[in-house]
């Protein structure tokens, strides 16, 4: 079955369950046949427990608090990505997909049963402080994250601009936990950034998949076409994902009309297909996609679809491996559910859940100590001849590069993968490899302008 990508809430079954739950709590019932009978009996027990707590617990408890706690527990038994959202949390999610919210600027997930940083958002307090993709958050302030749901962790990290929160990080290869005290800010996300590399290579940095990402990318590609650029690098490193529809809208600009981009499959086994809806076939110019362990979800849809159609070469390191689809389901009281409703598959039927996308060409980022030495060498040449103090390796960012946002001051020289500033091509060996490959590509094949 083909899906219109504009539809987001395509699975509504859980709403029925919650309606039945409310019905039982107020004394209503329904036909006791099949699974309904089993569910009814279980809900009778739930109602009895609720009644006993209200009658005998040592302190008076609000029914709303008990029911919300039960809902959270219900969703916690499913998977780390399913969660209940209070009305306040639900509103924040709606704001976030539009590109602005308050907090420290990291996307989180569950990996190896621990709260993990999928990616820091470029130019935010978390990124500037040196938090990296792959870090594990073991405490928020002094509270352990062991039993926190994803939504609860998000809530604890967000807050008013100017307020502070301390995250305790466990980093692979570092023996002791690392405390980071961050000052919250308004997180504004510009999803598409561009520049020209080596005179004729279009570079597109996609930081997240938002409602406007497809439109913004289309505008950027049209501009590059006017400049007659001959090849493109699509940088998805440290892109934690976003909207499924945005991933489809980005992918369809590189494949022929009617081509399958991704399909999702729920427990009923039905395939919902998302096809390219472009009217005209795009130019088939050389395309390289850069990925790393911070590339997740919607990023992996793009990084899976385009190679399946022979439209791109993937360079970098293995991606995060989040291959499940969460649907946001609004509830009558203004709250909502974030529920895993399906898994997604690339056009060739590959699932990336827990495995990720393995690049065609594996290139690991430059070690931070090498970057620090290179930076010191440059400073010695440019300065008065006096050597400068070496950069502490622990403070040298190793996440991939990107262009500074308009209106922001870029760092003097970012380390490879420092998205808050402009890393030089010489320092970013993953980007360097992409440029080298495109140069070779141009030698062996006549290229059409973009």
Q: Can you annotate each of these PLM segments?
A:
Residues 12-27:
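Hydrophobic membrane-insertion alpha-helices, especially the h-region
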Residues 5-7, 314, 415, 442:
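Cysteine endopeptidase catalytic domains of the caspase/legumain-like
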Residues 2-16:
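N-terminal Sec-pathway targeting helices
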Residues 34-58, 62, 66, 75-107, ...:
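Glycine-biased strand-turn-strand hairpin within the trypsin-fold
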Residues 336, 343-450:
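Conserved functional hotspot residues or short segments at active or partner-binding sites
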Residues 2-4, 26-42, 46, 51-63, ...:
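Cleft-lining beta-strand/loop regions that shape enzyme active-site pockets
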Residues 57-118, 164-166, 170-181, 189-194, ...:
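Extended, small/polar residue-biased N-terminal targeting/export presequences
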